[in-house]
């Protein structure tokens, strides 16, 4: 698995100022403006070392004020968009002292970083097609000093410095980058002529999930569109949102062929350098909504019924040679008394080992959470299945210590046979795939 050079981290740590998360090239000076044309350089966790190595000489030569993350883990978190969607891709932030300096730095940084990869930065304007340089007019001191984010118009009126669509250039300013700026011809909501997205169900760095209407059939049907963005949340193994959606399409086709209740694929296509899956919309409800951690209704009988339905499905999946690696209640839908399974971006062949961990931390075996590879087997699914059963029986996640689980089993009256099955799943270390 590819890891970037740590040389750039050493150079960042030698920058004169740090707040623990960000390192700064120099202190803020009195003659530095409070607002202006802010530049951002985008990077993935794999391209960050090269982006920094090429950009730093340009910035140092111009004595530019800039900040960079102290750790790659911070960039990885920013690129996920989970905490703040507007921060995706913002590896280097530069605070030019004038419009002229902003134009010069944008031009030089674009040339210096040409050919490197980085995710598209939401709400910023892109300097040129395929450029890593983005810009927006905004407050500087909020980022440097933590003061409130407001900008002033020429007449003195204050406006909140919002990061939102169409807000990169305030309406009272001319865009000095307009000759090089990328023009968007995309019509909102329309992916293809016969697909109309009307609601974003989820939005993060690697892509979005949308409810849409498919106009290509009569009667028209509601569908789910899954988007994979190029360079979105690029992982240590080099896979980005685009690659994950393409991979999920392959997995879904194989699992449907094996008789698993996964969504049907209606269409797959690429547009604007992103990849899209048009999927069957699963009606019904998830076992547990994504924003809830524990079920409101619990009983060991309910846990047993879930196991009775879900365990044979996972056994069939494993017999087909696949491990899900993202088994959790929000990915399991109850539809007309039967279970339907969704979200297979992280699925892999049982014997594949060169992959980083995948899934929600509470459903990943503790021994696998900080590793950069996996051992062969179905242990991720086994552990997750044990966690789900425990949740619906006890109303909480299973304690790691066996004696604490035993106390909960006794206090809540868990049948011994079910208790043994759950503990066996939680302690699974080998593949349960049957050899034919």
Regions found by a protein language model. Name each.
Residues 354-368:
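Conserved activation segment of eukaryotic-like protein kinases, specifically the C-terminal portion
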Residues 264-275:
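Short beta-strand micro-motifs within the conserved protein kinase catalytic domain, predominantly
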Residues 37-40, 199, 206-246:
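ATP-binding glycine-rich loop module of kinase domains
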Residues 318-334:
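Catalytic-loop of the protein kinase fold
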Residues 1-213:
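Phosphate/pyrophosphate-binding loops and the adjoining catalytic core of nucleotide-dependent enzymes
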Residues 343-348:
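Activation of the activation-loop gatekeeper triad in protein kinase-fold domains
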Residues 306-307:
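Activation segment signature within eukaryotic-like protein kinase domains
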């Amino acid at each position: 698995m590819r890891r970037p050079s740590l040389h750039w981290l050493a150079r960042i740590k030698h920058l004169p100022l740090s707040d623990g998360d960000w390192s700064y090239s120099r202190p803020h000076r009195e003659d530095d403006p409070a607002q202006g044309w802010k530049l951002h350089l985008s990077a993935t966790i794999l391209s960050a070392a090269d982006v920094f190595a090429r950009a730093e000489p340009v910035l140092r030569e111009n004595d530019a004020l800039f900040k960079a993350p102290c750790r790659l883990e911070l960039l990885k978190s920013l690129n996920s968009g989970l905490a703040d969607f507007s921060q995706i891709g913002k590896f280097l932030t530069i605070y030019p002292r004038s419009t002229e300096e902003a134009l010069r730095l944008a031009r030089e940084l674009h040339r210096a970083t040409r050919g490197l990869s980085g995710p598209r930065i939401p709400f910023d304007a892109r300097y040129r097609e395929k450029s890593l340089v983005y810009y927006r007019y905004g407050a500087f001191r909020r980022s440097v000093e933590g003061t409130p984010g407001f900008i002033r118009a020429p007449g003195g009126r204050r406006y909140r410095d919002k990061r939102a669509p169409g807000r990169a250039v305030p309406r009272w300013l001319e865009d000095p980058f307009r000759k090089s700026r990328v023009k968007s011809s995309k019509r909102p909501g329309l992916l293809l002529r016969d697909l109309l997205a009307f609601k974003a169900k989820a939005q993060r760095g690697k892509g979005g999930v949308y409810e849409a209407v498919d106009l290509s059939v009569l009667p028209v049907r509601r569908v789910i569109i899954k988007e994979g963005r190029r360079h979105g949340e690029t992982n240590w193994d080099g896979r980005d949102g685009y690659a994950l959606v393409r991979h999920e399409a392959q997995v879904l086709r194989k699992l449907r062929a094996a008789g698993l209740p996964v969504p049907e694929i209606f269409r797959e296509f690429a547009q604007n350098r992103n990849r899209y899956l048009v999927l069957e919309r699963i009606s019904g409800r998830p076992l547990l909504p994504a924003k809830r951690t524990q079920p409101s209704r619990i009983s060991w009988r309910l846990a047993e019924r879930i196991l009775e339905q879900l365990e044979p499905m996972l056994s069939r999946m494993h017999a087909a040679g696949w491990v899900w690696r993202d088994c959790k209640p929000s990915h399991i839908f109850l539809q007309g008394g039967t279970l339907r399974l969704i979200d297979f971006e992280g699925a892999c062949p049982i014997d594949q080992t060169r992959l980083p961990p995948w899934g929600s931390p509470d459903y990943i075996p503790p021994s696998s959470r900080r590793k950069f590879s996996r051992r062969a087997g179905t242990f991720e699914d086994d552990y997750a299945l044990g966690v789900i059963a425990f949740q619906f029986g006890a109303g909480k996640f299973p304690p790691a210590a066996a004696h604490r689980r035993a106390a909960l089993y006794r206090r809540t009256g868990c049948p011994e046979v079910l208790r043994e099955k759950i503990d066996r799943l939680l302690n699974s270390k080998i593949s349960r795939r049957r050899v034919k």
